[in-house]
């Protein structure tokens, strides 16, 4: 069975799933799908028009965590969710914190940080407080021993390595303050960047980002 991962490699959520597939050694294809497209069939595959989504023999699956859980269930080799229910729950917990309480909060700043827009001072102030709160909570949960959940690479690392560098970058750009500065991010990113799978994902991300920038300049 071959899965098709749909979306674009500049998306951190797309790369979370791509890294999972590469780490597990699962054969898959990629289909370039941009968000914001008017393609009528897109909502049949991803009802909100979001990426990533998976095309499977049974049908499409949207939302990255649903995709990740499906992959773990269908392909048990090289498990990225522990078999122990508590340990697996702790990995899921870390993913939720890195996404819901960090990346999605920082996303409020993306219009100004990356897209030439402007974010209100009120939004910046509120976002900073939420980020500080989220980072403090995340720090209580994470291990960095040397991986996010402990000595083994897990799905939490697939999420962390695509989300946390963005949170760090955006906070420095908007506030001049890295909200993750008290975490051992430099060592962690260095460790992760030694993995061939992460190198591959990063190379594709850079190429996709350049393609996006070129497309946006063409529209102007």
PLM segments and residue spans:
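A generic structural-conservation signal
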Residues: 30, 151, 201-202
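GST-like fold's C-terminal all-alpha helical module
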Residues: 98-194
């Amino acid at each position: 069975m071959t899965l098709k991962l749909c979306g674009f490699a500049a998306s951190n959520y797309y790369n979370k799933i791509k890294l999972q597939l590469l780490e597990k050694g699962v054969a898959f294809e990629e289909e370039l799908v941009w968000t914001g497209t008017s393609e009528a069939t897109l909502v049949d595959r991803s009802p909100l028009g979001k990426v990533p989504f998976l095309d499977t023999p049974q049908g499409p699956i949207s939302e990255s965590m649903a995709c990740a859980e499906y992959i773990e269930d269908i392909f048990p080799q090289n498990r990225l969710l522990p078999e122990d229910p508590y340990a697996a729950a702790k990995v899921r917990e870390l993913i939720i914190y890195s996404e819901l309480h960090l990346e999605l909060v920082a996303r409020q700043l993306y219009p100004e940080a990356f897209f030439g827009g402007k974010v209100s001072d009120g939004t910046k102030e509120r976002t900073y407080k939420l980020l500080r709160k989220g980072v403090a909570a995340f720090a209580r949960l994470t291990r960095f021993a040397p991986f996010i959940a402990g000595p083994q690479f897990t799905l939490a690392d697939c999420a962390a390595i695509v989300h946390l560098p963005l949170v760090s970058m955006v906070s420095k750009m908007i506030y001049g303050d890295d909200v993750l500065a008290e975490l051992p991010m430099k060592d962690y990113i260095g460790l992760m960047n030694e993995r061939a799978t992460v190198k591959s994902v990063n190379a594709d991300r850079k190429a996709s980002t350049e393609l996006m920038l070129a497309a946006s300049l063409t529209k102007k």
